[in-house]
């Protein structure tokens, strides 16, 4: 059951299940996006970098974070728009085989007319060690609860 704007109170914490990033994820994302930078696609090259191995695309990890939240079905029937992202930072690499999950905290709510509201989340993607690998603030435009007549 989807949540309405009014149900997103300040400091509400939402957490997803984990998802392991696979070789197939990285290869598929390279093909889909056209991002064949060797850090993502060339084992031998990646060994010469400070990471010592290939890393997942940052945009892949962001996309996975959106997917993990979508699977929770929190706003499937009430979301009106993905309004934007601010302050995005990739803080640690994600390696093939790492498992990521998302923790979001409601940091702002703003009514936007009678039928909708804007919710701002402080979002963190965490690896299997609990380390933040990606941090950002995202905004969703969500339906307000219909008034009863």
Labelled PLM ranges:
Residues 1-9, 90, 94-149:
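HotDog/MaoC-like acyl-thioester-processing domains
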Residues 1-56, 143-144:
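Catalytic strand-loop segment that frames the active site of acyl-thioester-processing enzymes
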Residues 38-40, 51, 80, 85-87, ...:
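Short, intrinsically disordered/low-complexity patches at protein termini
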Residues 21-32, 61-67, 87-88:
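Phosphate-binding glycine-rich loops and adjacent basic patches that engage nucleotide phosphates
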Residues 31-35, 67-74, 128:
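Short, intrinsically disordered, mixed-charge
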Residues 47-56, 62-107:
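Hydrophobic beta-strand-centered segment that forms part of the acyl-chain substrate-binding groove
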């Amino acid at each position: 059951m989807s949540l309405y704007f009014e149900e997103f109170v300040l400091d509400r914490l939402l957490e997803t299940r984990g998802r392991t990033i696979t070789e197939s994820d990285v290869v598929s994302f390279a093909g889909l996006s056209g991002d064949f930078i060797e850090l993502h696609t060339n084992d031998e090259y990646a060994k010469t970098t400070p990471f010592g191995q290939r890393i997942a695309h940052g945009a892949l990890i962001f996309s996975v974070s959106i997917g993990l939240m979508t699977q929770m079905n929190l706003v499937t029937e009430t979301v009106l728009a993905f309004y934007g992202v601010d302050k995005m930072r990739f803080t640690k690499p994600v390696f093939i085989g790492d498992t990521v999950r998302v923790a979001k905290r409601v940091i702002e709510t703003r009514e936007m007319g009678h039928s909708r509201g804007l919710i701002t989340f402080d979002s963190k993607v965490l690896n299997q060690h609990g380390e933040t690998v990606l941090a950002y603030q995202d905004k969703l435009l969500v339906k307000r609860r219909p008034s009863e007549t």
